Amino acid sequence: MDVEAPRALLRLFDGVDDPRVERTKLHHLTDILVITLCAVICGADTWTEVELFGWAKVEWLRTFLALPHGIPSHDTFGRVFARLNPDELERCFRAWTQALATASGGRLVAFDGKTIRRSFDKANGKAAIHMVSAWCRANRLVLGQLATDEKSNEIKAIPQLLALLDVTDAVVTIDAMGCQKAIARQIVEQGGHYLLQVKKNQDTLHDRIKETFDELTVRPIGGVTASFHEDVDAGHGRVETRRIWTTEWTDWYAQRGEWTGLRSFVCVESERMANGQTSIDRRYYISDLGGLDARTMLDYVRGHWAIENQLHWSLDVSFREDTLRQRVGHSAENLSRIRRLALNLLRRDKTCRAGINGKRLQACLKEDYLVRVLSRGI
């Protein structure tokens, strides 16, 4: 059996510092990290399940790991991940994903946050961890992630994560939490373009854009018209219509110079009909993109929504992230990174037509397929 792919993982984790004192190092750190990644790919969600996977696959694991004292106990896995420096693991993770990500003009990088709901520790006053991720739509890869104590700290985490990534010629999309002048400026200074949803509590900006589109979606204003596109999706007893209007008419906004490179305003309307009821929602965006038609802009907006469907949903449903109880030290944050790495590898494999759950089962049952999944990281 080809073991080059598993051995490559040893090199991936080479830069991670071991937090243990020498006398407690019965097991190699790289062994612990690689076993955990393989186990998570194969369906393990808890430290007990990681240990069970290790003993079930111990002969195969010995073909590329040292395992001087066999498989570590579930307590050992938990202790090591609780003490492991999250920044070290993130640095290795980011170097790997950025090497794989397509560096092409127009690629979309979506920033969004997700709370690991059961990572809180009420007894010790520890809030649930909120992970901010950067998602590349073209590769369906998580490019990087940072942890914050709560959702409100996304405003601080986004610039920090952005500074670590290459967004040259990329379109960076962020929801309303990230609609900040400093963030827009940083994206442009790093060579990217921005498409930011406007917050409702940004009264002057939000209300002025709303007033403009309330009229512009009905009739031209002084000869100015908006580019328009409409998509209709029907199925499962519902009909969803998405309409988008874009305009590069920005002269009316007196503070436009405060937003670096501002060139266009966007209005997206979602109309949903289900069970005899209709709901309509409008969202507004600002962007430094120009010369694009409404259809292209809607593609970018919908591309941002994909982070919810293709990343957050998979972590909740396939990896049960919101039900898991890793609370001690850095264990929740570090294991979250392992789950995202596993998801990246599983998504990159195109040889199996099953969904993520099916691929995890296939990897557990067939070592050849597990090696194939691991090879997607080489």
Feature roles, as predicted:
Residues 1-111, 116-121, 133-145, 159, ...:
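Dynamic "connector" segments at or just before major functional cores
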Residues 31-37, 76, 296, 300, ...:
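A general alpha-helix detector
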